[in-house]
């Protein structure tokens, strides 16, 4: 569907739930845990660098793994039932590492971080709108 993920005009702001860098973060975590070989990870990394278009800005919503864990428990979703704080810590650390690594490349997108603990959805949206004008 046209316009779902890509803006129709150059000045459109397009929000996606996850940054493309999450793919790298999860691949790094899987590789670190021994579930992806060096050859597989290096192949993934080459394809990642080649195929994924960089966004203009990445806005990272920062929340502690412990709070994420409590929210997952409160939602009661079956698909989240097996999550542990340790796993979420690994995802958190791997994502932050991938974001920082990605921001060191030439022509990398601007990285902005927003601490969202205690913020309501409306406040988060307002802050993102303010950040997008910077």
Pin down the residues of each PLM region.
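Short beta-strand segments at enzyme active-site cores
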Residues: 17, 58-62, 111-113
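A basic- and aromatic-enriched beta-loop-alpha substructure that forms the phosphate/nucleotide-
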Residues: 1-37, 59
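Short, solvent-exposed loop/turn segments at secondary-structure junctions
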Residues: 20-23, 64-66, 118-120
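Structured loop/turn residues at beta-strand edges in well-structured enzyme cores
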Residues: 9, 53, 109
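A glycine- and Lys/Arg-enriched "phosphate-lid" helix/loop adjacent to the NTP-binding pocket
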Residues: 25-94
């Amino acid at each position: 569907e046209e316009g779902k993920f890509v803006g129709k005009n150059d000045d459109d702001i397009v929000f996606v739930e996850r940054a493309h860098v999450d793919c790298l973060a999860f691949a790094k975590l899987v590789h670190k845990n021994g579930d992806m070989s060096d050859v597989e990870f290096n192949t993934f990394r080459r394809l990642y660098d080649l195929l994924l278009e960089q966004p203009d800005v990445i806005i990272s919503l920062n929340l502690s793994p412990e709070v994420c864990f409590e929210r997952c428990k409160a939602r009661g979703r079956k698909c989240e039932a097996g999550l542990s704080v340790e796993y979420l810590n690994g995802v958190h650390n791997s994502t932050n590492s991938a974001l920082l690594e990605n921001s060191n490349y030439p022509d990398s997108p601007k990285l902005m971080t927003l601490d969202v603990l205690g913020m309501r959805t409306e406040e988060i949206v307002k802050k993102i709108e303010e950040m997008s004008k910077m």
